[in-house]
Amino acid sequence: CTVIENAAEEPEICDLADFLREMGADITGDGTDAITIMGGKELHGAVHEVIPDRIEAGTFMAAAAITGGNILLENIREEHLKPVIAKLAECNVKTEAVPEGLRVSRKGRLHPIQLKTMPFPGFPTDMQAPFMSLMAVAKGTSVITETVFENRFIHAGELQRMGADIKIDSRSAVIEGVETLTGTKVKATDLRAGAALILSALAAKGETEISDIYHIERGYYKIDEKLRALGAEIERKDVH
């Protein structure tokens, strides 16, 4: 018997446990901070459908929010996105559960918020950078506090190049919303930073060129094609 203490409670952990149980494993406690595994069983094959990517869903919700768009997200699990949905509501973004999925829309300017990242079921650290893009064009002062990872505000410098007013103080970022951002050449420094730059580019005036997009491709499958399908002017090109 193995007991994993201080275990992550994220939906992805529960999904992995579900998969292993389907293969014959004896696992209990997933979704809590203590997981118990009874070893010694021979595992067998299984067919398993992986849960939808809640961070990709959250990123598209943020895309609708920053552009003032109206999109329908299919195949998502609302219970995995509760903290994101709650913060979007504070931002003046409407989410509505419909038979086909979740509809996301905004009328009027984004509102500023106070946000603190936490392990699940708190606000996900992977949505911190996309929300910084939202707050950069909100009306008023927002504060984001990062409690999960160190040095996770690297994207702030690239957003500043687009005209964002962001000040970093240790684990907190203070964002004064501006009317508009301006397109320029920026660099994706990591996966979620790259997503944040795409969001800001969608809302910015003029053209934005994002380099080092291999970071983005690590976590978003054909994001340019999906955004084009929603009406975005975005194209991938080789730069030599």
Whereabouts are the PLM-identified features?
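Short, structured segments at the rim of ligand-binding sites
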Residues: 1-240
